[in-house]
């Protein structure tokens, strides 16, 4: 079959002085950073949905891209053609992983039976593509938000039959992820929230969502899936309010249903922006709570109130993010998935490469700066000094539960405490 991107062999590293827009300037997969190859640190993934499924339509205009696999035709044949192009792209871009929703890779069909049969055929296609290319699956997931049946949510839907249909999709998508050697399975509740409280039973919907997640965990163990389960927080859009608002909110939810040791987080930069947080904040919070799993690398726009899913371009912001990740030991099953799309005006097929190359170079340079921060150690030293009082006898007695509130009041009076503020620098 003729290559779709026939004017490009593979994207290669040419160094920071290169003027070639189809070459890496900072991402050198084999370069050692803190003793580990850059490729192993970053674990780049390209997403199926924005890259190959979006046709360029928006709220005010029809599709603008005119991709060959988005034309009228036999659905499975078009899905196979899309897979051909996707894996050509992954290979030429030098990404190690990819990610998908079930209906990104397979036609949904007109019934559950058609959905399951179509997906089974496409899983075999994807398995062959993975074997041929060496590209692996970072994570799979089920799209339980696009079809009109999910207008009022999936797990939080008032109708248990919709809940059951969603369960079928998750079972099928998780088993497909398992068969394809996926390293994670993601749960994003696009419509697990509400439009108005006037027709919403918050307690009921929370109980439904909690039970659904418990069943997901049960099924993971039943089929022997060794990957990580990930929830992806987002505060709103398409609903007015989503129940997985941010990292801290999800932690409270997981604790309530006894799932905090079973599920971790997939943090997206743009979702942090929508929640009123920095990307750095959400990563640091997930790490502090022991829930850090993976990253959707993109960016939003602080002046816009929706999910713009732009490619990351801030080395400063992402150096701080990579610094936190390196300090925490780096990725295990997770990675950096580019949940990002070209703009509607970017109709040239090679624009897909320009966007990803710039993003990969941004994250690579951010990694190198973060590594220098680790090696320098100055920031860690200052933080350790700032909290050094907690290593004292008093600090340790407080933390170990050896002093009560009344004990501390007595201690403060007996020692005539008069602490002086120390600069935070």
UniProtKB/Swiss-Prot annotation:
Q: Does the keyword Transcription regulation apply?
A: no
Coiled-coil region(s): none
Keywords, comma-separated and alphabetical: Carbohydrate metabolism, Cytoplasm, Isomerase, Magnesium, Metal-binding, Xylose metabolism
Q: Where does Mg(2+) 1 bind?
A: 232, 268, 296, 339
* One example of a Gene Ontology biological process annotation: D-xylose metabolic process
Q: Tell me the cofactor note.
A: Binds 2 magnesium ions per subunit.
- Region forming the signal peptide: none
> Calcium: is it a keyword of this entry?
no
Q: What is its main location?
A: cytoplasm
Q: Which GO terms describe its molecular function?
A: magnesium ion binding; xylose isomerase activity
Needed cofactors, names only, are: Mg(2+)
Residues given in the record as Mg(2+) 2 binding sites: 268, 271, 307, 309
An example GO CC term for this entry is: cytoplasm
Positions annotated as active site in the UniProt record: 101, 104
* Subcellular localization(s) per the UniProt record: Cytoplasm
Q: What is its EC number?
A: 5.3.1.5
How is this protein organized at the quaternary level? Homotetramer.
Family statement: Belongs to the xylose isomerase family.
HAMAP family, per this entry?
A: Xylose_isom_A
Query: Which protein are we looking at?
Result: Xylose isomerase
Please tell me the species this chain comes from: Shigella boydii serotype 4 (strain Sb227)
Lineage runs: Bacteria, Pseudomonadati, Pseudomonadota, Gammaproteobacteria, Enterobacterales
- Gene label: xylA
């Amino acid at each position: 079959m003729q290559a779709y991107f026939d004017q490009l062999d593979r994207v290669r590293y040419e160094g920071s002085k290169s003027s070639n827009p189809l070459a890496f300037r900072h991402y050198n997969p084999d370069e050692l950073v803190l003793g580990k190859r850059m490729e192993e640190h970053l674990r780049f993934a390209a997403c199926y949905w924005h890259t190959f499924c979006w046709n360029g339509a928006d709220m005010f205009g029809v599709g603008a891209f005119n991709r060959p696999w988005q034309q009228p035709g036999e659905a499975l044949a078009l899905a196979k053609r899309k897979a051909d192009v996707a894996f050509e792209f992954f290979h030429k871009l030098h990404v190690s992983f990819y990610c998908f929703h079930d209906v990104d890779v397979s036609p949904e069909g007109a019934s559950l039976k058609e959905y399951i049969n179509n997906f089974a055929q496409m899983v075999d296609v994807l398995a062959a593509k993975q074997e041929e290319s060496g590209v692996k699956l970072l994570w799979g997931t089920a799209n339980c938000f696009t079809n009109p049946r999910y207008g009022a949510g999936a797990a939080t839907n008032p109708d248990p039959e919709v809940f059951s249909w969603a369960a079928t999709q998750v079972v099928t998508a998780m088993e497909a992820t398992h068969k394809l050697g996926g390293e994670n399975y993601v749960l994003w509740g696009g419509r697990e929230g509400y439009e108005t409280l006037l027709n919403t039973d918050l307690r009921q919907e929370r109980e439904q969502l909690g039970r659904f997640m418990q069943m997901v965990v049960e099924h993971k163990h039943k089929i022997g899936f060794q990957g990580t389960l990930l929830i992806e927080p987002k505060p709103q859009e398409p609903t007015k309010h989503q129940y997985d608002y941010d990292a801290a909110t999800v932690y409270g939810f997981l604790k309530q249903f006894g799932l905090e040791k079973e599920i971790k987080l997939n943090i997206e930069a743009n979702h942090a922006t929508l929640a009123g947080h920095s990307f750095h904040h959400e990563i640091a919070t997930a790490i502090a709570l022991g829930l850090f799993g993976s990253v959707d690398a993109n960016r939003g726009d602080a002046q816009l109130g929706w999910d713009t899913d732009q490619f990351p371009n801030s080395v400063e912001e992402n150096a701080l993010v990579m610094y936190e990740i390196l300090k925490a030991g780096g990725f295990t099953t997770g990675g950096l998935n580019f949940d990002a799309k070209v703009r509607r005006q970017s109709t040239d097929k090679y624009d897909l490469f320009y966007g990803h190359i710039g993003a990969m170079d941004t994250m690579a340079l951010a990694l190198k700066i973060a590594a220098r921060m680790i090696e320098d150690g100055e920031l860690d030293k200052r933080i350790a000094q700032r909290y050094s009082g907690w290593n004292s006898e008093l600090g340790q007695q407080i933390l170990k539960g050896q002093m009560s509130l009344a004990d501390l009041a007595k201690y403060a009076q007996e020692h005539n405490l008069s602490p002086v503020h120390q600069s935070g620098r």
